[in-house]
Amino acid sequence: MGVNSYSEQIDIDNTYRLRMLISTLPPYAKDYFRGIQPHTESRTRIAYAYDLNVFFSYLHENNPIFAQKEIRDITLDDLEKLRPTDIEEYLEYLQAYTNPQNEGSNNTKTNHELGLKRKLASLRSFYRYFIQHEDIMYNPVDLVTMPKVHDKAITRLDIDEVALLLDQAESGDKLSEREQRFHDRTKLRDVALLTLMLGTGIRVSECVGLNIDDVDFKNDGIRIHRKGGKEVVVYFGDEVESALLSYIEERKKTEAVAGHEEALFLSLQKKRISVRAVEKLVKKY
């Protein structure tokens, strides 16, 4: 696998996921996603597709005009008949709803300010594409006020809290009995990963995407692949260098699963560690 293999594989996986999601939407949705591809990330298109799936499912299940229609049979002419009040009712619905396509005991979905704003933005983008291509002449979403997102206080760790977090990762004192059984096998990895993120401010997604040869000890920097394929070097200090050196000595002795040989941080399954696993790791300590 090459230097860009992780990000490239994510895009490939997202392409297949997007195709699957588009297959559940009306045929003209394919034109929209093809149109926005040059200026959006694959993850953004996936998010928009999920949002549109929720919207069309809502119309089918809750709007009497569309009750007799399958989702794929809803036309652009149908969408042009909607009014701002229909969109406002949809936003109210999004605050708490159940997904009819996913039966189960824990099936209630909720959206607060940020989630409502994103879903309205997805729908607005969808309508505007067809307005620009003169397939429709009326966009009810533009007449709906975007939900206001109230700023939240940013939680930052002070120096003592950072030191305590790293101490706990090294000692494992606060872990459950079950977690402590795995601690010796993951301690160097966890300390290196946390020290790197705290010491450089890189994102979790950037951290899990690192390969071994992205680390440059000669210049004390790591090569990061950011959105749009942009490559940057982020420099680190002595504490990060020490933690990485200790971990990499152990990492070199680990034979990774085929296809994950170049990954810097591995899971216990000897595969590239996932974003979700890192989030659980941080929560654990």
Predicted region positions:
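Conserved catalytic core of the tyrosine transesterase superfamily
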Residues: 1-285
